[in-house]
Each structure stands twice: as C-alpha cells, then as structure tokens.
Amino acid sequence: MCTELSKRYEYRRAFSEVRLLEAMRYVRLEDGVNYNFITAGDVDSTSYLKVVLNQHDLDYLLISTWVMSAEDAFQIFEWYNTGCIRKIDMYFGDIYPNQYKMEWKMIREFYEQHPEAGRVAVFSNHAKIFAGYCEVDSFWFSCQLSCNANTNPRTEQACLQVNRGPCEFYIEYFDGINSFKFDRYG
C-alpha cells in the first residue's frame, strides 16, 4: 500500500513542481520582494523550497510543519547529503510521532546519524514555514504556507519573502521552542 501511495504522490508532486517551476523559471528571487501564490492543491511546501534551491544553496534551513511525508523528508535529507543545505532545524506538530510513525523514525534516524545537521523538535505546532539563508549570496528568505510538506487536494496559498527581517524573526522564535520529545541539537 505504501508503494501505491508513493507512486500517486510522485505524479501529483511532479505535476505541481512543473507548474510552479515554470511560473518561476525566469524570475530571479530579489531582496525585498514578496512572491504570492495560490494553487489548486497540487503543490506542497517542499515545492517552494525547490524554487529557492534552484537559485541558492543554503547555509541554514528552518522547517516548521504539522506533518511531512517520507518522500519530502527523503528529498530534504538528499539535499543535505549533497551539500545544498548545510544545517536543518525541523519543527513538527504534536501528532506527528504517533500518527506518522515510519516518517518519524526516518527523521529521528537521520538526526542520530548526523548530529551536526541541526535540531528536530515536536510541540503544539501547526505553523507551515520555511526560513533560511545563504550568507555568501546575502540571501535570506522565509515562506509562509497553508500547506504541509505533503500534497493534498485543497486550494492552498503561500508567500515567499526575500528579506532578512522575517527570516531572523522566525529563527529567533523557533530557537526558543521546548520540544515534547526527541529534542536533538547539533
């Protein structure tokens, strides 16, 4: 059953990423600009991260989501392993460890094998946010989304901000979070 869901998910994700990437193909992400999106539910939050990574490797990435699919976690870990992202702090909703056991195990194992990678935390979280930076490019961004890091059939919205202020605002807030379980610091 997991394989069937994965194939279906990959199709929807490929379709959504193609549309999003085509819309942003010739758009250089510029400091001080907010990019607003609305979709018919075939885009997940990781699709927006791909837009950013097509232009910049990241020294740091903050991910806040209620839930994350195994496919998205695997993709993010692949970006870490290839050096596209050098540090990742992940913050999940309190339902995640018990309702997404396979995915939670995968994430815990990643941080156990890579303690230098960053932090993972679980708390009463429903915020869907990416924030990060590349110091050498002087690039700072945040992305506020209605969608989680898994595709769903709903209308969703996102705002990608290229601006240091909101990025630092989110990093400062999430750095102060106390985790319910498995708080791993790098």
What are the language-model segments listed below?
Residues 1-186:
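PLD/PLD-like phosphodiesterase catalytic module centered on the HKD motif
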